[in-house]
Amino acid sequence: MRQTKTGILLANLGTPDAPTPEAVKRYLKQFLSDRRVVDTPRPLWWPLLRGVILPLRSPRVAKLYQSIWMDGGSPLMVYSREQQQGLAARLPDTPVALGMSYGSPSLESAVDELLASDVDHIVVLPLYPQYSCSTVGAVWDELGRILARKRRIPGISFIRDYADDGAYIDALAKSARESFARHGEPDLLLLSYHGIPQRYADEGDDYPQRCRDTTRELVSALGLPPEKVMMTFQSRFGREPWLTPYTDETLKMLGEKGTGHIQVMCPGFAADCLETLEEIAEQNREIFLEAGGKKYAYIPALNATPEHIDMMLKLTAPYR
């Protein structure tokens, strides 16, 4: 009997190819055209997207990307490649491909790369610790579209999420402890997750619960009293209500109340990106300090740390 050959597909959101208005516009157009991300009826959404959002946001967002761009590209791409290489180094007989929902390398190019390596089973690991229809669901949808065009369909193992996985929680806890050792233990640890529209949760997306699961397990692992930890949601977009409390408003309130020392971690981001390095580490830091806060530190994402690679090994092990 022929032995199954397995490959691993690491999936993430994506990034512009360059910190220019043109590249950002291409990326945002693809991202904001996905019904999993914005489900506004298309006759209403297309004119708004093409006539208002893309022309206005692309130059502004490009400037933000310029402030965090690295020699090897956007931080998300640099760290994602390091994750791919780190996992591949630990699994020399298992092909590991990287694919993005938007931009390049695409999910289709990752599937093609694995099929070219003659795999007949693919383990798909979306690097979103907490399931949401707008992230993990988008990977699932695109994977279905890709495979619908193939004559040869491999076996698929799809890891839905890992919000309360022990190796993931241990990696987060180690990162937090290292930050506490470097900056001192904070008055408050703020756990900021990417937001989604409240309506998505009302319609059945269990993302808020999965965020609560991560928070509960991390607080337990750190041994912190509940009053020293807060959970908030960032990066809201548009006018409809999103999950609350909002990170920026909470930081302003905490600064005004006289909270002295805050450290912020973003457990939902597997790799540092615009939303962590610019929005959290810079914009929200200014909000807190200008409101009266004294000390603010951002705890980096897990990126390609050995603990993060260990977690990927453990998550994929049952399917290899």
UniProtKB/Swiss-Prot annotation:
SUPFAM superfamilies: Chelatase
Coiled-coil stretches noted in the UniProt entry, renumbered to this chain: none
EC number: 4.98.1.1
GO cellular component: cytoplasm
GO MF entry, a single one: ferrochelatase activity
Locations listed in the record: Cytoplasm
Group of enzyme by EC: lyase
Reaction catalysed by this enzyme: heme b + 2 H(+) = protoporphyrin IX + Fe(2+)
BP term (GO), one: heme biosynthetic process
Involved pathway(s): Porphyrin-containing compound metabolism; protoheme biosynthesis; protoheme from protoporphyrin-IX: step 1/1
Binding site for Fe cation: H194, E275
Keyword Lyase: yes
Keywords from the UniProt entry: Cytoplasm, Heme biosynthesis, Iron, Lyase, Metal-binding, Porphyrin biosynthesis
Keyword NADP recorded: no
Pfam families reported in the protein's UniProt record: Ferrochelatase
Main location: cytoplasm
Family, similarity comment: Belongs to the ferrochelatase family.
Subunit structure: Monomer.
Annotated NCBIfam families: hemH
General function of this protein: Catalyzes the ferrous insertion into protoporphyrin IX.
Name of the molecule in the record: Ferrochelatase
Gene transcribed to yield this protein: hemH
